[in-house]
Amino acid sequence: QNVKQGIAERARSHAAEGLDQRSNPYRELPRAESDARAAAGEPFAVRLKVPREGQTRFEDIVYGTQERNYSEIEDLVLLRSDGHPLYNLSVVLDDIEMAITHVIRGQDHLTNTHKQILIYEALGAAVPQFAHLPLILAPNKGKLSKRKHGEVVSLTTYRDRGFVPAAFRNFLALLGWSPDDDQEILPLRELAEKFSLAGIGRANAVFNFTENDPRHWTDDKALWMNAEYIRTMPPAELVPMVKAELRAAKLWREEYEEDERAWFERAVELIRHRFFTLKDFSSQGRAYFSDDFDFDETAVSKNLSKEPRLQEWLPELATRLEAVDPFDAASVEVAVRQFADELQVKAGLFINASRTMLTGQAVGPSMFEVFELLGRERSVLRLRSGVPWFASTSLSHPVKTG
């Protein structure tokens, strides 16, 4: 209590003299008195005695010249009264011990840098180069934090939601930095070749997302980039990732590794172009790997319900396709278009209806390629499976096939 009273009295005295209230109350305490009081067991802290005149100055690689007057810097505490070092001393000693030449960190540490330079100089150590990076902010321009923003800032979230590691790394690299040629898709090797601190901007990046919105749960640019990687990465890299996703969803068959490997790789190649995450292979792409799949209600409404005559026409189309030989994309296309011409309707009616019946979706790859991939037996069965529920007025329960 006496120590606190003494500090308060000295602070009031300094304030009366026009000194900064942050000034060290013991700054002018004679060394002999300080040593005697410490030897007598009085608690004490160790401070850095900052010069009153002059300034610290350094060239930040990103933010340029940084200056601060000594009068704006308090006599910072280096060691607490319990002997524990504070942050600024700890990081300086750590960097000296590891012979760090470049300190690269967030721009919220710019203020600390002036204090740390004083410690380097007091210890007679070489001052490293500093590069302070712009921050990544939330949509409201506040700092991102796990406490406030939860899963959206957790790497495991992106792993569990089907992000390709290389894609997410690429996305993060472009938050605050860009290459000279504005290229956006940058595999690791190219990132390493093109990256330079000179390419880092000074403006903070904003991580755009909408909380509690399943469509915009993360930044749209991150999803776009993930889709680009899924569409363009070498099959040898993508196929094992899809295998892991299907295995987790209990859709993997060992035949895909053996007799049906060529079919599996072809399926991945055909359907990957509209997917945004690896999860899409087991959700939107489920119909390719299982006969137990859901129908998208929008797809049913758009492609089936508007034309009640499809209840009769689709089984007839199935009968036509049973006779198609060979059962490939070109032959199926001829059969579908001929059938549409005979009924004097547009072929698109059957193309769209077939897509929903065979995959449960409203959009997807070339429908005739889908017919060929799924094969005659599954295609015919699925075209006929809609009859029992075509007249249903409710889709409150997922429609299954098989």
Question: Could you say what each language-model-derived stretch is?
Answer:
Residues 2-132, 137-146, 154, 179:
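Active-site cores that bind ATP or allylic diphosphates and position pyrophosphate for catalysis
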Residues 239, 305-358:
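C-terminal accessory/binding modules appended to enzymatic or scaffolding proteins
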Residues 48, 222, 354:
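Conserved S/T- and glycine-rich ATP-binding loop of Class I adenylate-forming
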Residues 118, 122, 170-174, 354:
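Residue-level signal for well-ordered alpha-helical scaffold segments within enzymatic catalytic domains
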Residues 102-106, 157, 303, 320:
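Short histidine-centered catalytic/ligand-binding loop motif
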Residues 126-295, 359-397:
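Catalytic adenosine-cofactor/nucleotide-binding cores of aminoacyl-tRNA synthetases and other
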Residues 98-103, 153, 317, 335-337, ...:
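Glycine- and acidic
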